Amino acid sequence: MGSTNKLKFISLILMLIINYQFSNSQIYEFGGIFGGTNFIGDVGDTKFINPNESAFGGIVKWNRSPRHAYRISFISSNLTANDLDSNDPRRNERGYNFSSNIKEISTGMEFNFFDYNLHEYDVTFTPYIYSGIIYSKYENLFFNGNNLENSNEYDWSFGIPIVLGLKYRIFEKFILSFEIGARYTFSDKIDGSIPYNENFNFTFGNENNNDWYMFSGLNLTYTFGRQPCYCNIK
């Protein structure tokens, strides 16, 4: 099964799960994601919060209780990095750079630090954390000597999101969230440091450290659904 078919299959499974939850639950949110991304790996700067590319996407949540919600999201962005932006003189001298389009599907659980019942309008904000699993699809890149090559194919990797956020009710039905999240991927190939093709054996960087990328931005969601009864939730 090709990477495109894998992405379609996983998207279908996740949407079936969401549809099932919608038919059996009470409080939902859906909306848009807007922000920026930056890469942390074997090329470029290593600052954790340094967005240099715009990102956008969508998000759906099922609020299972005032303290936790299940969610699924999609983000599209580019990951770019340039050794000349690094504080490491060895990277400055090397001078590598890359740019790769990336698409991410994420699903997992969001935990609120405070009780956050969407039908109690005096409850206006809460910090939260989110984690789960991500599926990232990115371009296959490799370096042929000092030249970056694009295979015009895509690869994919699973990963783990580690997200800290703050949500705030701005209107009766609208929630604005700000979050900063790291994505630890199970791949070290996003920046082209490990070629996907065995015919190109030029590698560089630390092969024991996988690639990371960050998302910093806003979620704006609309809430709907009848008032829930949380009395049976344990």
List the predicted regions and their residue ranges.
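Outer-membrane beta-barrel translocator domains and adjoining extracellular loop/strand segments
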Residues: 42-47, 83-89, 120-123, 140-147, ...
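Short loop/turn motifs that connect adjacent beta-strands in outer-membrane beta-barrel proteins
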Residues: 23-27, 66-67, 115-125, 170-173, ...
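Predominantly the C-terminal beta-signal and adjacent terminal strand-loop region
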Residues: 81-84, 170-234
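Residues that define the transmembrane beta-barrel architecture of outer-membrane proteins
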Residues: 26, 50-54, 101-105, 125, ...
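Extracellular loop and loop/strand-boundary signature of outer-membrane beta-barrel proteins
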Residues: 40-47, 90-98, 147-152, 203-206
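Short glycine/proline- and aromatic-enriched beta-strand/turn motifs that initiate or cap beta-hairpins
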Residues: 23-63, 140, 217-228
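Residues on the lipid-exposed face of transmembrane beta-strands in outer-membrane beta-barrel proteins
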Residues: 32, 36, 58-62, 107-111, ...
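Gram-negative (and chloroplast) outer-membrane scaffold detector with strong preference
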Residues: 68, 72-143, 222-224
